[in-house]
Structure formats: C-alpha cells, structure tokens
C-alpha cells in the first residue's frame, strides 16, 4: 500500500470518561488531557493562535512533533511533464500503469487532477477540485479532494481507473468536509480528519462518522492509526485521540502539552509555560 503525497492563565480540568472501554491507554509523556472549550474557553481561544502538532508513527510508536520551519519542498515531477498555468499549488503524484496522475491544491485559488501519458505530451483533466492526497491501496487508486475556506467546507473521494481505452474517475463518497488530513488503516479504510469531524470510508464508499465533536478540529495536519487501533489527529495546539470501544464506537480524548496548563496570548501567539 503506497501513499502518494505528496497542518491568559488558567487551571486545566479534564474531560469525563465514557465506559466501557478496554485497555485504557496512558497519555503520551509530556502531554495531559485537555478541557473542553466550555470548561476553559480562554484555553481554546489561545489554541487558535497556537503552533501545529504533527503526528507520525516510528516503528509503530506514536511520535508528536512540530512542523519544519521551512516550507516543504514540492513533490518533484518527471521532466517530461509540462504544466499549464492552471496546474499550480501543492502537488500529489502517482505513477500509473500507462502514465502519471498529478493533483494540485492551491486552496481558494483552485486545484485539479490530471492524468499524463508516459511521454508527457498528452494530458487529461479529470477533476477541478483541490487534491489533498492520492492513495494507491489494495483496492485501487483514490483521490481525496475538497476545500475549507470561509463558509466553504466540502470533500469527496474519487476512484481512478485506467484502461487501454480510457482513464476516468468515479465518485466514491461525500466526506461532509474537506479532507485536511488522512491515512489508510490496516483494514483498508480511509481515516479522514475534516474541520468538523473524523470519518472512516471503506473501498465500497460506506462512510462511518467516528467523531463529531462539540469542538471543531483546529486545522488538522496529520492522522495516524497505531497498533492498538487508536486514531490520532494532529492539529493546531491539540492532538485528538480516538480510543476504540467494545461496541465499535470511539472515546475521544483531547490532548495538549503539559506546559500549556498555563498559557497566554502574546502578540497573537499562544505561548505556554514560562515562555512569557
């Protein structure tokens, strides 16, 4: 399975726990359970000015880090692929049987999905939507597209197919929001964080909402699923953890850095601990 990709002071109470849930997990070292926005609105205001958290897996273990200071380099394209003016923004790239699939995401300025032949002298526009990710899974090739900007918040999954006669995409699922971060779990499901929810979609297009919070997700950056089946979504200031239960539902646990139990907004930056 290949991924082609190419974001005041207070005391802090905790969420209540739902039950029953097997195998209660420890909170990652240096992190604590965060309060709801209702319990501590000042913290959530500060979080809107906080730095982003990036989640990843290293040898199956969760790692939480900060994004690099420099902008990530663009995905390099084969030299023979010639881009038009409308092909701009961050890129996703996947080699196909007879060519290349290239996606673009320029936010509110547009995007799209194109197929190029091997020689690069022919291309076909397949979608006019912003492409967030292209996946090659055991069930085929899929593109996650969408946009969250001002009042807009939409997202879709399309399946790409390629034959000797044609290349095309077919609609698989409506995500209900822009796929800001995503991954594929061990069952082959897409696990997607939108600005307002976390959903899972199987290869047949069946969507299941895993979490729709009282809290909007604060600009999701990344999603991973660990060996226990716990889902982690990194975002601005927080990490959301979803712990699977016996009945197939998920218990949400909002996490934040321990030092952020004291915080202050300084020059429109959320500053934690003794840094202010």
Regions found by a protein language model. Give the residues of each.
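Repeated scaffold domains used in trafficking and secretory/extracellular systems
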Residues: 32-52, 82-95, 127-138, 175-184, ...
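Conserved beta-propeller blade signature
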Residues: 53-56, 63, 100-102, 141-143, ...
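A short beta-strand motif characteristic of beta-propeller blades
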Residues: 73-85, 120-126, 166-173, 207-213, ...
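Short loop/turn segments that connect beta-strands within beta-propeller blades
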Residues: 116-120, 161-165, 202-206, 243-247
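Short loop/turn segments that connect beta-strands within the blades of beta-propeller domains
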Residues: 50, 57-59, 96, 109, ...
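Boundary at the C-terminal end of the N-terminal hydrophobic targeting segment
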Residues: 14-18
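Structural motif
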Residues: 63, 108-114, 150-158, 197-202, ...
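Bacterial N-terminal signal peptides
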Residues: 1-11
């Amino acid at each position: 399975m290949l991924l082609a990709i190419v974001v005041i002071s207070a005391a802090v109470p905790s969420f209540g726990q739902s039950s029953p849930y097997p195998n209660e997990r420890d909170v990652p070292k240096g992190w604590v359970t965060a309060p709801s926005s209702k319990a501590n609105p000042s913290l959530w205001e500060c979080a809107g000015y906080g730095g982003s958290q990036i989640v990843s897996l290293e040898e199956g273990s969760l790692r939480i880090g900060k994004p690099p200071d420099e902008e990530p380099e663009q995905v390099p394209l084969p030299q023979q692929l010639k881009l038009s003016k409308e092909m701009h923004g961050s890129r996703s790239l996947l080699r196909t049987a007879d060519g290349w699939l290239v996606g673009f995401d320029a936010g509110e300025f547009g995007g799209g999905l194109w197929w190029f032949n091997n020689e690069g002298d022919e291309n076909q526009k397949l979608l006019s939507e912003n492409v967030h990710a292209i996946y090659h899974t055991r069930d085929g090739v899929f593109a996650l597209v969408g946009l969250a900007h001002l009042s807009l918040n939409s997202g879709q999954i399309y399946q790409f197919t390629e034959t000797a006669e044609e290349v095309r995409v077919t609609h698989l699922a409506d995500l209900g929001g822009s796929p800001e971060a995503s991954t594929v779990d061990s069952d082959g499901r897409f696990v997607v964080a939108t600005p307002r929810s976390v959903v899972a979609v199987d290869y047949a297009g069946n969507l299941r909402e895993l979490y729709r919070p009282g809290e909007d997700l604060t600009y999701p950056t990344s999603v991973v699923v660990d060996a226990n089946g716990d889902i982690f979504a990194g975002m601005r200031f927080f990490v959301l953890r979803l712990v699977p239960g016996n009945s197939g539902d998920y218990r949400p646990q909002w996490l934040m850095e321990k030092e952020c139990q004291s915080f202050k907004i300084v020059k429109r930056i959320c500053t934690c601990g003794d840094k202010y």
